[in-house]
Amino acid sequence: DALRIDIGDAEAAYALACAIPEFERGDDALDLREFRQRLSGRSGLVLLALAGDRAVGFKAGYDRYGDGSWYSWMGGVLPEARGHGVAVALLHAQEQWAMAAGFERIYVKTRNRHRAMLRLLVKFGYDILQVQARDDGAENRLLLCKRLRGDG
């Protein structure tokens, strides 16, 4: 089936996140209330990647900082749907949406152990701005940014 990107909601993003093995359980357990809090209201956006009628990936973000930047909070692709351009399609769709909405940059945080995500972000022009070191280097948090418009 052809892939298409559509608008979703916090509940759809949460359901997909729960099916993606890389997301933390335990201390950082996924919480539907947190999804609703971060993604509800006019500043939240959930994009769903659909193969036919089945959601196979998502990208969710919101206006976290109120400074003209967009915060890409969470996203992922189901393991069986990887390797087919789903993450790239979601990344581009979110960038296009953010530009059309007037945002100047996109921030995203990831962890060192999420190598595929890091490669994708760097490949498509995201710069590493900051590293929060952890005892286990694989758990280092990385803040990346991509400028969508302008020189500043």
Where is each model-derived feature located?
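Conserved N-terminal entry element of GNAT/NAT acetyltransferase domains
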Residues: 1-11, 146-152
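Acetyl-CoA-dependent GNAT
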Residues: 7, 15-73, 78, 91, ...
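Short alpha-helical
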Residues: 12, 67, 112-116
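A short, internal acetyl-CoA/4′-phosphopantetheine-binding micro-motif in the GNAT/acyltransferase core
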Residues: 74-83, 110-112
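Conserved acetyl-CoA-binding loop-helix of GNAT-fold acetyltransferases
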Residues: 77, 83-96, 119, 123
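Conserved GNAT acetyl-CoA-binding A-motif
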Residues: 91, 98-110
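Conserved catalytic-core motifs of GNAT/GCN5-like acyltransferases
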Residues: 107-110, 122-143
